[in-house]
């Protein structure tokens, strides 16, 4: 009589699967903590001349815009450029912070693709 081959999961594979689930759970818990941490952060971005400051959370949620009186004197078009510069700076810093925090979260877990 021929023996059935089953699903190909030996004890070693089950152990690997169990470890993968544990790692996934660690990442999920860490991601929740990271989300909370990023939400509490305030990341500033500045225009090239420093007259406009944008503050975002670590999750890239806009918090505030501060415009110095000198920026108002430059006219609408220049002011728009300064606000855009400050927003891009804050966004870039926020993205870098998120990336760094995610690398810290996943380092040492030996996750494929990360």
Swiss-Prot record:
Keyword DNA-binding: yes
Gene3D superfamilies tied to this protein: Nucleoid-associated protein YbaB-like domain (3.30.1310.10)
GO molecular function, a single term: DNA binding
Pfam families per UniProt: YbaB_DNA_bd
Keywords: Cytoplasm, DNA-binding
Entry-linked InterPro entries: YbaB-like_sf (IPR036894), YbaB/EbfC (IPR004401)
GO cellular component term, pick one: cytosol
Places the protein is found: Cytoplasm, Nucleoid
Chief localisation class: cytoplasm
Function in brief: Binds to DNA and alters its conformation. May be involved in regulation of gene expression, nucleoid organization and DNA protection.
Family affiliation: Belongs to the YbaB/EbfC family.
Assembly, per entry: Homodimer.
The protein's name in its UniProt record: Nucleoid-associated protein PCC7424_2224
Organism: Gloeothece citriformis (strain PCC 7424)
Taxonomic path: Bacteria, Bacillati, Cyanobacteriota, Cyanophyceae, Oscillatoriophycideae
